[in-house]
Amino acid sequence: TEPEIRVMILELLKKEGIIFHGAYDNLLLNTENGFIKSINLDGRIIEPELVISAVGFTPNNILAEKAGLRLTPRGAVKVDRSLKTSDPSIFACGDNIEIINEVTKRTDYFPVATVAHDFAHVAGENAAGGSAVVNTVVKNIAVKILNKFQVSVGITEAEALQNSIPFKSIQASAPNLVKVMPDSRQVFGKIVYHALNKNILGAAFLGGKEVSGYGDIISALIKLKSSAHILADLNYNYTPPLSPFINLLSILGRKVK
């Protein structure tokens, strides 16, 4: 996600007494009888109570390899828009294939259950003789971090750089409810948009459950190739127990230049 949100998440962890160790060149696991007893972090020994392996995902392509199917450089099963593999009688979907990123128009890999579900319908229909095709995908991922939620939509600034897309970004914080309400708290949002045509490229949010809705709105606007200016023109609902008087998205839209 965006660097500003990474800093905020680190502060959340610190407040809860959780120590974060990152960016080590040499990380060694010291094991005994198959159990991790300690971790060597560039010479510093830490004895954890619990170890969780969260090193990312790779496609499970064992069956595809045995079937002789063509794979991509990422190790995913290569498919066309009908989800047909290199064997015309075999279709693939889910976490073992790549998708076409709506923003970059390039192949990408992010195993998301909602995308897998949608693609499964297409693969099943075509395996039965149909002619359906899949669409490009907007990355729209939410995770819970302690008492907050983080949402990433589209591409980040770093991904825009990697894909040579000229971009600008704006950010703001605003209360999720009017300040007199007991559940009012700050929500952070950042929009990445094309430097020339102002179309929305991506966004990131950190706050309460409301950020899920923000993410879905941005995802739809990316699909519609909408300018970031439209965020200031939308009509947002308002009622004190549920929604803010001035929506964070509206504030962000007014900052677009």
Where are each of the predicted segments found?
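Flexible, glycine-rich terminal cap/loop adjacent to redox cofactors
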Residues: 148-150, 163-257
